[in-house]
Amino acid sequence: MMAHMGDGYRIESATPADAAAVAAIYAHHVRHGTASFEIEPPSEAEMAERMAKVLGAGKLWLVARDPSGRVLGYAYASQFRDRPAYRYACENSIYIHHDRRGEGIGRALLALLIVAAERHGFRQMIGVIAGAEPASERLHKACGFVEAGRMRSVGRKAGGWLDTLYMQRALGQGDDTAPDEESA
């Protein structure tokens, strides 16, 4: 994917060398928030494995970097579920460095991820928003997602019960047409 320049940052494809920075950003969210239902953050090695799985499957992982190359946030899309019938649906994940939230980095990452997912042939993108994350819900709404469902009290973290909100957005032609391989 080509680089995209933002105000004080650029967005480009992630590489395995980004695993340490990605792990650090994610660890903060695991320890101090409810955006992830993980209780203990993964190690740098585990994050490198997760990234390799997504990148190795030819899927999408983007990072936003400041001019010095520091990772400010990341977003990725992978197949929504493993079963073959889900092959046209992807799930996005977005995490921004806690010091850089509210600057539009998440919106820029998600907008580019949507374009890349459309080019990849996905027809639906799902945002799975865990816990109490109104900023993530606003971000997804701003990028054209609508609420598709809510599972109540399915997680427990930080002494409370947490919901999971599913938000969905059609990509490209969505479900208006069959994929090319089926229409031949």
For the regions a language model picked out, list residue spans one by one.
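Acetyl-CoA-dependent GNAT
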Residues: 41-99, 110-111, 170-172
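Conserved catalytic-core motifs of GNAT/GCN5-like acyltransferases
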Residues: 76-79, 126-129, 141, 146-163, ...
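Conserved GNAT-fold acetyl-CoA-binding loop/helix
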Residues: 23-51
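Acidic/histidine-enriched, glycine/proline-rich intrinsically disordered or flexible terminal extensions
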Residues: 173-184
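Conserved acetyl-CoA-binding loop-helix of GNAT-fold acetyltransferases
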Residues: 102-115, 138-142
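Conserved beta-strand-loop-alpha-helix junction that forms the acyl-donor binding cleft
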Residues: 101, 127-137
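A short beta-loop-alpha structural element at the N-terminal edge
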Residues: 10-22
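Conserved GNAT acetyl-CoA-binding A-motif
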Residues: 117-129
